[in-house]
């Protein structure tokens, strides 16, 4: 075989091999899934228990994880809003009454509000719930002290960040939050370079189950990965250890 031809063939094989080796990570980068957390805030209504049961079925249908938040009082009235969901769904508290915590004037009463809400959730769910979302998103300078003293390690009270307890303090991580009523699939970035922060879609239990079902069907078409709150913070938020 002509030396020049052999050399050209060898060079071509090397180039092809290099392309084969480089393409998988390149394609992986190009098609990075967008992380999406479905966050449901549940208030006490006449049909709340039925709504929760139907929601659990929709989440299972779409193989979707999520985070559910409710007050201790709502949980007592509608325990199905805890027991209906699989272990893949994180359950968090919103105090006991569901009222704005900063409006409680005394610190010890604020602490009792947070602790009692968590206690009810824990007893019904038979787990140690470590996540919290302040009612109405209302917080003040006491929030992290209250959470730490209550054994809560993750906070989803804000629209632009979530906070987790690490090395003796709460640290924040950026998120992008959307109201389910106004959310559009156009809000999901199409480029991997833009898929930097997790997206949280906020639902309340005044949204029809059929609408949630339809929205999840549309979202799944956009190369997303549904994540739980535990996935985001990197540790289990509904632990059964020690119970």
Where do the model's predicted regions map?
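Catalytic grooves of carbohydrate-active enzymes
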Residues: 37-46, 51, 173-232
């Amino acid at each position: 075989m002509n030396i020049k031809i052999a050399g050209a063939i060898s060079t071509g094989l090397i180039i092809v091999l290099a392309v084969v080796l480089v393409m998988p990570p390149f394609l992986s980068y190009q098609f990075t899934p967008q992380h999406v957390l479905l966050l449901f805030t549940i208030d006490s209504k006449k049909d709340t228990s039925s709504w929760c049961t139907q929601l659990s079925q929709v989440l299972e249908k779409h193989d979707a994880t999520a985070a559910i938040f409710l007050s201790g009082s709502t949980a007592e009235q509608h325990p199905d809003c805890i027991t209906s969901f699989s272990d893949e769904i994180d359950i968090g508290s919103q105090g006991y009454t569901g009222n704005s915590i900063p409006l409680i004037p005394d610190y010890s009463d604020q602490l009792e509000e947070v602790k009692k809400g968590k206690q009810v959730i824990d007893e019904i769910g038979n787990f140690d719930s470590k996540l919290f979302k302040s009612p109405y998103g209302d917080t003040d300078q006491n929030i992290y002290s209250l959470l730490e003293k209550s054994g809560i390690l993750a906070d989803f009270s804000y629209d632009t960040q979530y906070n987790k307890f690490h090395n003796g303090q709460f640290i924040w991580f950026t998120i992008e939050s959307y109201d389910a009523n106004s959310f559009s699939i156009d809000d999901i970035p199409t480029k991997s370079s833009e898929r930097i922060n997790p997206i949280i879609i906020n639902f309340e239990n005044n949204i029809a189950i059929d609408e949630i079902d339809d929205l999840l069907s549309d979202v799944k078409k956009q190369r997303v990965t549904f994540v739980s709150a535990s996935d985001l913070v990197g540790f289990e938020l509904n632990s059964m250890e020690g119970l």
